[in-house]
Amino acid sequence: GSICLEPKVVGPCTAYFRRFYYDSETGKCTPFIHGGCEGNGNNFETLRACRAICRA
């Protein structure tokens, strides 16, 4: 899906949520820390969800 091509967005807030995003350069779902606000669709709560949607 097109959301898988969106860049990783940490966002300006300072919360600490462990999430996963699809890295289109490596073709893998990769963990990152999300700040809790803003961002885009390339932000998954689980590795399984990221892999399922982005077929990683």
Curated annotation (Swiss-Prot):
Entries under SMART domains matching the protein: KU
Keywords: Disulfide bond, Ion channel impairing toxin, Nematocyst, Protease inhibitor, Secreted, Serine protease inhibitor, Toxin
GO CC terms: extracellular space; nematocyst
Site keyed May play a key role in exhibiting antihistamine activity: positions: F17, H34
Domain BPTI/Kunitz inhibitor, chain residue ranges per copy: 4-54
Pfam families documented for this protein: Kunitz_BPTI (PF00014)
Location of this chain's protein in the cell: Secreted; Nematocyst
Chief localization: secreted
Cross-referenced SUPFAM superfamilies: BPTI-like
PROSITE patterns in alphabetical order: BPTI_KUNITZ_1 (PS00280), BPTI_KUNITZ_2 (PS50279)
Coiled coil regions in record: none
GO MF terms held by the record: ion channel regulator activity; serine-type endopeptidase inhibitor activity; toxin activity
Function: This recombinant serine protease inhibitor inhibits trypsin (Ki=100 nM). It may also inhibit the TRPV1 receptor of the pain pathway. It possesses anti-inflammatory activity in vitro. It blocks histamine influence on intracellular calcium concentration in murine bone marrow-derived macrophages (84% inhibition at 10 uM and 67.2% at 1 uM), which can indicate inhibition of H1-histamine receptor (HRH1). In vitro, it shows cytoprotective activity in the oxidative stress agent 6-hydroxydopamine (6-OHDA)-induced neurotoxicity model.
Note: Negative results: has no activity on Kv1.1/KCNA1, Kv1.2/KCNA2, Kv1.3/KCNA3, Kv1.4/KCNA4, Kv1.5/KCNA5, Kv1.6/KCNA6, Shaker, Kv11.1/KCNH2/ERG1 potassium channels and on TRPV1, the capsaicin receptors.
Family per record: Belongs to the venom Kunitz-type family. Sea anemone type 2 potassium channel toxin subfamily.
Protein known as: PI-stichotoxin-Hcr2p
